[in-house]
């Protein structure tokens, strides 16, 4: 890392850059492209003759040529999983968005290391037992990688940190699950299996592992299917209409964590949350201005998604209540326990 701030071109696309990403001077867009391709471990198909031009801004290079250009620029795949993978050349403090990107990348890496999801042309659908087990493990991964970042960024004291944590976990899981399912016909579990969406019946289907005394899959599906459809419409459909991107998703996630007016939240914690929320909002405005020019309507529509999260949470709480009352399949979901302020068993 040099001490003097330097502006130099991205060695991949030629745009101005002041960052070293994965070992090479690169703009954030090319660095994020390289990171996604390495983490996905998906073989990029070469559909051209390797003649894509990076000089013509009007022509977008294919993924194969762009990835090869990243390697030629000096980007290293091993650095994607290194703590030193991304750093700024300048002395300026990292933006909250950059920190969120690093924290979420660690979360994704933790999921890949734990679940080892595989790309399959014939994806597997999970049962409610499998989904509950995966969710329990994933919550710990979220705690270790994302929530730990929030708590280190702005410590509030153990009691208030716990208040923010307990009010964040379930909304974030719902928000994250919907975001990762954009463009797909169903939700994707962190282990790569599918559930919900157009295939609710598969989640509650009878299996040899079903517990005795629990209502059959047909009954569970008939009661719960309408709630799945409502939840699908509240969050996932709205995200798809807005074409929410990763940076917008991360900044909104930060606003969900640093919320205010929560039960058992102290006045000081509310004040601190409002202070850091202002910084997050400024970064969102800056990001949208850079992405497509000043667009107040776009920002307003994106912020509207925050109003959808409590609605999705209410639907999930109703599902939890009905599951217990009617002894339905899936009643052991850890999100139900957390949403009623009880720790998951």
From Swiss-Prot:
Ranges annotated as DNA-binding: 7-82
Pfam families, sorted: Hormone_recep, zf-C4
Name of the protein in question: Nuclear hormone receptor family nhr-176
The organism of origin for this protein: Caenorhabditis elegans
Family matches, as InterPro entries: NHR-like_dom_sf, Nucl_hrmn_rcpt_lig-bd, Znf_hrmn_rcpt, Znf_NHR/GATA
Record-level GO cellular component terms: nucleus
Function: Nuclear hormone receptor. Binds to xenobiotic ligand thiabendazole (TBZ), in vitro. Involved in the up-regulation of phase I detoxification genes, such as probable cytochrome P450 cyp-35d1, in response to TBZ.
Gene name of the record: nhr-176
Miscellaneous: Thiabendazole (TBZ) is used as a broad-spectrum anthelmintic to treat parasitic nematode infections in humans and veterinary animals.
């Amino acid at each position: 890392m040099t001490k003097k701030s330097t502006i130099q071109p991205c060695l991949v696309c030629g745009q101005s850059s002041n960052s070293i990403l994965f070992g090479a001077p690169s703009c954030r867009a090319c660095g994020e492209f390289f990171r996604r391709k390495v983490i996905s471990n998906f073989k990029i198909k070469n559909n051209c003759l390797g003649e894509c031009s990076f000089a013509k801004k009007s022509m977008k290079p294919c993924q194969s040529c762009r990835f090869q250009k990243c390697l030629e620029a000096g980007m290293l795949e091993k650095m994607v999983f290194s703590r030193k993978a991304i750093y700024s050349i300048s002395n300026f403090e990292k933006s909250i968005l950059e920190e969120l990107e690093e924290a979420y990348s660690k979360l994704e890496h933790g999921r890949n290391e734990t679940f080892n999801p595989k790309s399959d042309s014939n994806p597997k659908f999970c049962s409610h037992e499998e989904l509950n087990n995966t969710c329990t493990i994933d919550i710990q991964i979220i705690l270790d990688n994302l929530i730990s970042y929030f708590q280190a960024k702005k410590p509030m004291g153990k009691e208030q940190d716990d208040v923010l944590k307990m009010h964040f976990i379930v909304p974030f899981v719902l928000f994250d699950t919907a975001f990762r399912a954009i463009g797909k016909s169903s939700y994707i579990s962190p282990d790569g299996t599918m559930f919900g969406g157009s295939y609710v019946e598969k989640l509650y289907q009878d299996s040899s592992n079903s517990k005795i005394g629990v209502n059959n899959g047909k009954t569970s599906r008939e009661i719960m299917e309408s709630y799945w459809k409502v939840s699908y419409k509240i969050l996932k459909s709205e995200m798809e209409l807005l074409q929410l991107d990763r940076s917008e998703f991360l900044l909104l996630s930060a606003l969900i964590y640093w919320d205010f007016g929560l039960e058992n939240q102290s006045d000081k914690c509310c004040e601190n949350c409002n202070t850091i929320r202002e910084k997050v909002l400024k970064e969102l405005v800056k990001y949208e201005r850079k992405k497509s020019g000043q667009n107040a309507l776009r920002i307003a529509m994106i912020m509207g998604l925050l109003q959808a999260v409590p609605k999705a949470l209410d639907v999930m709480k109703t599902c939890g209540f009905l599951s217990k009352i009617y002894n339905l399949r899936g009643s052991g979901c850890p999100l139900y326990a957390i949403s009623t302020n009880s720790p998951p068993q």
